[in-house]
Structures are given as C-alpha cells and as structure tokens.
C-alpha cells in the first residue's frame, strides 16, 4: 500500500483561468520548504496536489508544508487498487489503530471515475456496514462526526484517508506581486509581513541598522525574525541599510520634535528606491494607527508625502493585544521582545510631534543633502538570502563546539 500526502487548495479553487499559475507557484513554494527532503516529488493536479514521499518521514513532511500559504488542508492518503474488498481491509486496518470507544464516524465518498462498479451511496453503505460490524463501539453520525473516512475513486486507483489537517489558507506567496517590508526588531512588523505574505505577496525585508548606536545582536535578532516568517514562503531577501550617518545629520539640523518625522521620511525614501531596484510594487510596514507618535494619521500624511508607492499596513486597525496574539501564533513574539534597541528607539526624542505639519517637515528636511544621503545609504545596503533554517553566527559556533564533543 502506497502512501501519499494530499493537499487541498484554498482560495485557488476560485481563480478560474489563472488557476494554473497559482498551482505552479504553490508547487514551487512547497518544493522550497522541502529542501531537507529532496526525494519528495510534488505532483500538481487541477483539484488537488500530491506529494509522493519516497520514504521521507510523513509527519516531518507535513510539518514543513503546513505553514505554506495557499493550502486549505492536508491529508495522508493511502493508494489502493480499485477493489472494494481491498479498500475495506485498508479502512478497517486504519481504524483499528484509532481509539474508537464512544466515537462517531461517517464514510464520505468522492467519485471522479463514474464508470466504477459502485456508486457513491453504495460505497458508503458497503464500508459503513463493514465498520459497524468490525467495531461495535462506534456509531454513525453524518453531521460533525469524530472520524471521517474519505474515499476518492480515481481512474487509476482508490484513495483512502482518515485525517484532515488544517492548512494555512491564504494565497501562495508570490502570486500577488512583490513588496518591501520595513522590518524592525519589534512585535508589529513581523506580523505585518506574515499577513502580507498570506495575501500572496512575496516580501523582501528592509532593515535599518545604526552601528555603533545599535548592536550586532539587534541586527541578528531581526534576521532571525525574517527566518521565522520565511517558513511561510520559502526564503526571503534581507536588506541591511546603513543608517547611522543619516540619523547623525538629522540630529544636527532638525528640531527635536521633528526628528522622528524626518527620520521616517528618509526611511520611506530609501525603501522606495530599493523597491524600484527590486521591481517590487508596494511597501509594507507594521504601522498601527495611533499606537506611537509616528503612526498618527497626521504623521502618516507628513511621512507618506515622499512617495506615491502604495503602502500596505496589514496591522493598521488591530489592537496591540490582537497583534501580540498573532505574533505568538507565528512564534515571533518572544524574539521580538528581546531587549535590543533598534535605530528608531535609540534616536527617539522624548516628546515627538504627534501632529507634525507637512510644510515644516519639508522646510527642516531642506537643510539636509537628501539625495546624497539616500544615494550613500542605498549603495551601502547589504543583501543576503534568509531561509527558515537561518542561524546566527553565535548559534553556529556553539553547534560546532558541541559537535566536537
């Protein structure tokens, strides 16, 4: 008996003529997530996708593909010949491994081969009677049973499955275009990146580093956050922007109350230039309306003035507790609250303007060599690929020492 993993599509089922493009992208993302299991073969089909395991561990493969967006649900399926006696034996064998006391069940048959000798109702009755005879403790329940035995009659074979595992939903990463995520080391921006990816956006992470004011640990922490969200799409390009000189120049020339506004305007300009270089379509960030001084509507107007590029704000209307809940679900929260200050925190004024005037922001900014500073920062940007398996140099060194002993 051969085992496969069946993947059911989420919103892809509604995509009409574009469905092939969506399924191909999903297949590509799944292959990237299974880099540790090169023997697994991904087989896209119109209604489903299959993974041929070729001796790869079933549970480990399922754990790798569960976070991939575009998947509605996952089921281990057993491929058997088109013989109902064989199918009955497989169903009874599988159920014998379950705790059935006090449980309910139903048989659910899907028949794409309409030439098969039995119709859907006949298959349900045949297998249902066999289960009741073999396991007297179990009862039939057609609505919300504890166990659903799924039978799929295909042209080549029958497929039997007992378990359905919830997938991540959403759209395959990359099907909605590319966006640049402004990734700090905080709680909100990784959640924003996750939610943007869930709507099919491929993201590249832009991080502003200000050594020596910010530590190497702050940078590594942010790379680890990128690795956490890379699980949902395969791999992510991480762009480290040198920002110290810009912050020093701003602090010399701009009134304290406007430091944050001007700094954010520079960040947005630089991200927009990097977006253009990467041929991305939008910028995403973790701004939540009213949460801090730079995230009031007045501040957003003053900061957004520097670009016409669409700004995606996935957490804009979420309460902090709701953002934290998502951060905990995607395993970024504990990392985000590690006490390493980012460039915004280090240079934050004690009383930033919550209602900055656009005219004043432009006036103060005119004191600076805006184009020259942006050009220098963009040219000094370091790009690297971050995967879900990324580890910090400290972790790698520790592992190498452990391996010696």
Identify the residue ranges that each predicted region occupies:
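Conserved G/P- and acidic residue-centered "switch" motifs that form tight phosphate/ATP-binding loops
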Residues: 186
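Active-site adenylate/phosphate-handling loop in enzymes that bind or generate adenylated species
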Residues: 129-131, 170-176, 247-248, 252-330, ...
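RNA-binding accessory domains that recognize and position tRNA/RNA substrates
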Residues: 1-180, 190-236, 353-361, 367-368, ...
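A short alpha-helix-loop-beta-strand transition element characteristic
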Residues: 331-339
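Small/polar glycine-rich anion-binding or flexible loop at a beta-alpha turn
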Residues: 289-291, 339-347
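A conserved beta-strand->alpha-helix junction
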Residues: 226-252, 342
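General small-molecule cofactor/ligand-binding pocket signal
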Residues: 141, 239-241, 312
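Generic beta-strand/beta-sheet core signal
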Residues: 8-10, 163, 206-208, 241-244, ...
């Amino acid at each position: 008996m051969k085992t496969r993993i069946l993947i059911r599509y989420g919103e892809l089922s509604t995509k009409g003529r574009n469905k092939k493009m969506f399924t191909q992208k999903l297949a590509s993302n799944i292959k990237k997530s299974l880099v540790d299991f090169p023997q697994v073969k991904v087989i896209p089909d119109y209604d489903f996708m299959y993974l041929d395991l070729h001796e790869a561990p079933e549970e480990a493969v399922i754990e790798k593909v569960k976070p991939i967006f575009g998947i509605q649900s996952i089921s281990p399926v057993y491929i058997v010949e088109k013989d109902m006696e064989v199918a009955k034996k497989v169903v009874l064998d599988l159920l014998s491994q379950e705790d059935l006391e006090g449980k309910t069940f139903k048989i659910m048959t899907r028949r794409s081969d309409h030439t098969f000798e039995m119709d859907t109702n006949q298959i349900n009755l045949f297998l249902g009677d066999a289960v009741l005879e073999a396991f007297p403790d179990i009862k039939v329940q057609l609505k919300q049973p504890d166990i659903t035995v799924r039978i799929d009659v295909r042209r080549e074979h029958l497929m039997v499955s007992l378990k359905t595992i919830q997938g991540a939903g959403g759209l395959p990463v990359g099907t909605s275009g590319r966006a640049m995520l402004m990734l700090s080391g905080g709680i909100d921006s990784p959640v924003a990146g996750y939610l943007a990816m869930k709507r099919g956006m491929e993201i590249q992470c832009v991080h502003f580093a200000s050594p020596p004011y910010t530590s190497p640990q702050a940078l590594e922490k942010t790379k680890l956050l990128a690795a956490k969200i890379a699980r949902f799409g395969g791999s992510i390009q991480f762009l480290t922007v040198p920002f110290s000189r810009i912050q020093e120049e701003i602090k010399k020339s701009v009134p304290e109350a406007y430091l944050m506004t001007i700094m954010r305007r520079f960040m947005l300009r630089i991200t927009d230039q990097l977006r253009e270089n990467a041929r991305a379509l939008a910028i995403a960030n973790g701004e939540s309306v009213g949460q801090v001084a730079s995230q009031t509507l007045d501040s957003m107007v003053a900061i957004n003035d520097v670009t016409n590029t669409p700004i995606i704000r996935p957490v804009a209307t979420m309460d902090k507790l709701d953002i934290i809940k998502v951060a905990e679900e995607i395993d970024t929260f504990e990392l985000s609250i590690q006490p390493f200050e980012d460039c915004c925190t280090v240079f934050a004024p004690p009383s930033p303007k919550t209602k900055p005037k656009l005219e004043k922001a432009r006036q103060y900014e005119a004191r600076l060599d805006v184009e020259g500073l942006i050009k220098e920062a963009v040219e000094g940007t370091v790009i690297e690929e971050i995967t879900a398996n990324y580890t910090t140099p400290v972790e790698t060194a520790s592992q190498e020492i452990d391996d010696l002993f």
